[in-house]
Amino acid sequence: MPIISVFFGIVIRMFYKEHEPAHFHAEYQGQQGKFDLDGEMIVGNIRSGTALRLVREWATLHRRELEDNWESMKRGHPLGRIEPLQ
């Protein structure tokens, strides 16, 4: 479960051997969610509106890196770290 970014208490991961469509996982204060690459929560229980907004903002800024990591994951290659929100 490689961590690809951490910001404001939000941990972002991508798991190997995942299924389409492309997505990533976020955890915030013990709550978890699965997000599409646009940063929209597909399933999960993250209730903080602020955390959800920050994940969307981060995903929008780093869409290309998320796509690159998804392709690397499918090939079994190492995932790159992605800059956190500042």
Language-model features, listed with the residues they occupy:
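Basic nucleic-acid-binding interfaces
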Residues: M1-Q86
